[in-house]
């Protein structure tokens, strides 16, 4: 799956229960993941499951993330693992239940380790 195919699939999926939005930094990080030969199909499957409210396997380790960004009332930052050292972070809005995907990358890239 190419970068353009990835974003086309996100935009055109009618099976999603919730709307999917992304930031410019997320788009740049997806391009970087593609250049690093990471499988964008894996990322798409995780996002697709989240947007359909499907339960991800325990290997994805979905959890809330504190201290990452400025949370506003009714929203929280969440994180899961696409692969062991490949993270996906998003803002989950409780009132609208819209996921806004913000970043991908390894633990070292994400948290300056």
What do these predicted regions represent?
Residues 28-30, 70, 109-110:
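A short acidic, often aromatic-flanked loop/helix-cap motif at beta-alpha or helix-coil junctions
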Residues 1-49:
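Arg/Lys-rich, positively charged N-terminal/basic patches that mediate binding to nucleic acids
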């Amino acid at each position: 799956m190419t970068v353009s195919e990835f974003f086309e699939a996100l935009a055109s999926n009618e099976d999603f229960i919730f709307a999917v939005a992304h930031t410019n930094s997320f788009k740049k990080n997806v391009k970087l993941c593609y250049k690093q030969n990471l499988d964008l199909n894996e990322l798409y499957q995780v996002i697709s499951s989240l947007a359909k409210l499907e339960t991800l396997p325990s290997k994805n380790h979905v959890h809330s993330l504190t201290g990452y960004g400025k949370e506003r009332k009714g929203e929280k930052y969440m994180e899961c693992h696409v692969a062991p050292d490949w993270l996906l972070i998003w803002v989950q809005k409780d009132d609208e239940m819209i996921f806004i995907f913000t970043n991908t990358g390894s633990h070292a890239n994400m948290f300056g380790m």
